[in-house]
């Protein structure tokens, strides 16, 4: 029985071996099933042994100690090297190949992974990573586009703000370089804001790559910065309304810095010497008291300048100490005070007209004070400044209503004295300007026109005191004007002075018969008349022009303008219906007058040869306008003489 059992066992083993062989052969020719691996593998028991490296095979042992086949796990990182942030992610193939440690059961069997399945899985993983990279690229591109749009908006805002600042910029063209540097820093707030915002955004993106560029946050930062910039601009930039007192201090410091410095230096008082006799001590004491009084006046001026700079007081507080200093004995104090007062009145009569008046000026008393200073002081610079202030006062008043009130006997006497040679060129110029402004008053102009009837009237009992005063005053002034025409003419200012006199004579001639009589028959010293003086002046300048080959530009211009004014006056006199016969008769009544008239008209009507020199605007005036005026005058004179040939 035992023998039969052994044979049965042998046959049973052979049958099992043949079945296994047949199954193996069938597995070899069977087509591969679709790739499938369990999602999770059970965790091995404590006796299970796993290789430490993923590239080595894993060994699984059962509790019975039977040897199992080794499972080769492919390395999912051998085919490519993805980015760092992607490589930290767990790959699905790796999860499939490994086990889930949450389970405690042992995987008893695992199907081998074929090379074809591994390649397909790697291709699918590559496609997924490519899609993921495309999405990342789209996100970064969108973020970059948002940044570019923000930059363009910032640039547009900067250009608009720059244009608005350029429109508001005012001339305050005496600012120091420190203020200009501060303004320049403030003019570019958007650039600094843009760079700060970009740095903040870069730091935020470095901390969190998933955080995108926030447009709303940037706009809020720009708005906050623009508010701060607007506040700074309100401090630095000129506003629509400014207190004229603040502008006044800046103008005084710019135009009168030297004058104020000299004035403030008089605040120091030296003590009198102690070892002196009584007479010297008394004289020194009187002198010291005078200096102390002047120093006190200067200190009041200093206090007024300080207070008005802070807006505590009005302009009257500044004018009063200046007027007190104008009455001082020291010539330097008077001159410097007049210069500061000159700038102050220019500010009041100019800029302050746009604002509320801060000083109720008594122009008549101020005009009277300046007239006294101009007539009594001997210094030419003091006289000039006083006359300049008088001209400012007259120009600030209305010619039809208020200008007549400034005319007085004292004013006309001062003008006649200031027109003398001893006064100097600049004093004469200011006096002529003052007389021209007063003569432009319609009422005074009518008074000058009525002198012709009053002078021809033999009944002196009917002459009023005012007309007699006007006749005498005008006579002295016109004698001073005639003296200006005979003075030497060496500079352009001398020629300009003569031109101003010709303009006054032209204004007087347009008044009527009195003006024509003034020019033709008014007897001047040395038995001359204004017509003779004018012709002598014109011929003398023609001779000077012909002898100077390369005259200075300013002298040539002043001479050309003088010739033009003389020819305009002569043409007006010889063309008037009521004056032409009288003037032409006076021009040709004597041999000397006729010779001067014909010589001047003939020489000026000829065309000058420039000899290839470039023709300037003054040259064009000399060769066209003056030549035409001379030809018209020549035609009138020759027609009166009976010669119609030109």
Curated annotation (Swiss-Prot):
Compositional bias of kind Polar residues: 48-70
All copies of domain Phosphatase tensin-type, residue ranges: 376-646
Coiled coil: 123-157
Any one Gene Ontology cellular component term annotated for this protein: cytoplasm
The keyword Zinc-finger belongs to this UniProt entry's keyword annotation: no
Tissue spec: Accumulates throughout the root tip.
Site (Reactive bond) residue list: 579-580
Disruption phenotype: Hypersensitivity to DNA-damaging agents including UVB, gamma-radiation, aphidicolin, ionizing radiation and hydroxyurea (HU). Defective in cell-cycle G2/M arrest in response to DNA damage. Reversed extreme hypersensitivity to aluminum (Al) of the mutant als3-1, including Al-dependent terminal differentiation of the root tip and transition to endoreduplication. Increased tolerance to Al.
Annotated spans, Disordered: 42-70
Phosphoprotein in keyword set: yes
GO biological process, one term: response to aluminum ion
Induction remark: Becomes more restricted to the distal region of the root tip upon addition of aluminum (Al).
Keywords: Coiled coil, Cytoplasm, DNA damage, Hydrolase, Nucleus, Phosphoprotein, Protein phosphatase
GO molecular function, one term: phosphoprotein phosphatase activity
Localization (cell): Nucleus; Cytoplasm
Chief place of localization: nucleus
PTM comment text: Probably phosphorylated by ATR.
Motif (Nuclear localization signal): 119-126
Subunit relationships: Forms multimers through the coiled-coil domain.
Role description: Required for tolerance to DNA-damaging and cross-linking agents such as UVB irradiation, gamma-radiation, aphidicolin, ionizing radiation and hydroxyurea (HU), cisplatin (CDDP) and mitomycin C (MMC). Involved in cell-cycle G2/M arrest in response to DNA damage. Required for aluminum-dependent gene regulation and root growth inhibition in an ATR-dependent manner by halting cell cycle progression and triggering loss of the quiescent center (QC).
Family as reported in the entry's similarity comment: Belongs to the serpin family.
The protein, known as: Protein SENSITIVE TO UV 2
Gene transcribed to yield this protein: SUV2
